[in-house]
Amino acid sequence: MAEADLCTVWGDPIPGREKQAFNVYNEAMQYWAGLQQEGKIERFDVTVLAFSGGDMAGLLVVRGTAKQIDSVRRSKEFQQYIAHGQLVASHLSVARAYVDEGLAKFMGWYQKVIEQAI
């Protein structure tokens, strides 16, 4: 069961790199599908936003165990994937997230921190 997420958010393609951005997107979909087939992640979901004028154009959410997410994030392939993305998309960012059991643990920890701070 998933307990951790890896969220990648990106903005519009960098002007003049639209075609490259499209290719990087397609390669990323193959990369994540391969990891899912190999059992290295549980699943991934992609959302592309309608044109809004904002900084965010899309996001990808990868789900898995904390061990799976940490392993992927430390891999050479993932680092290269992010480097390619930074060359073609604006506002690219990656963050870990907590879901399901991981979220429950995080919120318990966070509540203790709040209680100690007050």
Residue spans of the language-model regions?
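Residues that flank catalytic or metal-binding motifs in active/ligand-binding sites
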Residues: 56-58, 88
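Conserved short beta-strand edge segments in small beta-sheet-based binding/regulatory domains
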Residues: 80-98
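A short linear boundary/processing microfeature
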Residues: 75-79
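Short S/T/G/P-rich N-terminal loop/turn motif that feeds into the first structured element of a domain
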Residues: 1-56, 64-74, 94-118
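Active-site scaffold segments
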Residues: 61
